[in-house]
Amino acid sequence: MANTGRFLLGTSGWSYAEWVAVFYPTSTESKLGFYSKIFPTVEIDSTFYAFPKEGMVIGWDRYSPRNFVFNAKIPQTITHERLEALGKPIEEELDRFANLMLPLNNSGKLGCLLIQLPPRYKFDSNHLEEFLSLLPHGFKYAIEFRHKSWLRDETWRILSKYNVAYTIVDEPLLPPEVHVTADFAYIRWHGRGQRPWYDYHYTEKELADWLPKVKEVEGSVKTTYGYFNNHFHGYAVENGLSILKMLDKLTPAQEEALKRARTNLRQAKEKPVGLGEFTRGGEDRAKLVDLLGTIMGETRLARSFTIPDEDVKIKEANLKTIDAKIRDYTLKMDMASKTIVHDCGDWERAIETRQLCKHIGKVLLTIPEQVALTWVSAIHENLDAWKFQQPRK
């Protein structure tokens, strides 16, 4: 088949503090504004963790180029918490999210809504059909399975019936099989790391192995969306631009961004960790600071060290629960439910980027190191499973 389709490639999310040293020239410039000059599309990852505010969606529309394309993840309250019990509650939540995304849909900037299912969700054709029948009309959808039982002909038949795109993945759980089930295609590169997936830098050979698959898909549909989700350290930017270069699709602006990303990543690997002065105190302390830097960003972590010890009051800190007060703010963490509830002003922004704020960092630096290491390792290894929340008012 002739290769006539569009291939729009970007990253999963764009507002990562650690990308400033690799991709973004400064920390003050609008990240979406700069990002949209380099990439034609982005996957909105923050909507998976919380419903966006109406003004935020309007802002995405207003401050992005006319032909820019967003794809948004459906909130996990729908796909993970309400999925088993289909009915009016989940239908209302779907309608609520769809209505919030209308500004992007009406302006032609919304490609599709992504349904990311939990690993526990196993093959059930009747349940899947019932769920797909509840999806609001007027939108396109892609669906990502996390269990191998879905890899069968019946699944492709159902998805084709509803024109829902099967999400082709590169990840540890499922094989990178190519299945086209809609008039567009969706590819996600998650990384192949173990602790977690996303902390992974694809090699040139690993990317080259994907070229035949990308070309096959691109020639079968009108539009192919591709997103690199290995966002740690800015790897997603470099890998995404690298595969575009291999496909001979790199623009001059992207070529310059790729050179800058490669140079900055190389220099980052060569220089010592910038927070070395805070790692004194043994191997556990060094590991704790290193892990915190990964899930906070060095700027927020550095600010954690500036908070006086007397500003922190620890009510409880063990392997099950953390209950603390930092200045006028509260923090409650629960290991069993994987929940973090906090109320500082920066926390609302941190929720969007899936990072811890300086106050949480300070608490984790204050409690016993072995306890803190257990918590930070659990968050680092399974970031997607954790719920970042504000107190209910």
Task: Show where each model-derived region lies.
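Residues lining hydrophobic/aromatic ligand-binding pockets adjacent to catalytic sites
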Residues: M1-E283
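Long, low-complexity, compositionally biased intrinsically disordered regions
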Residues: K271-K393
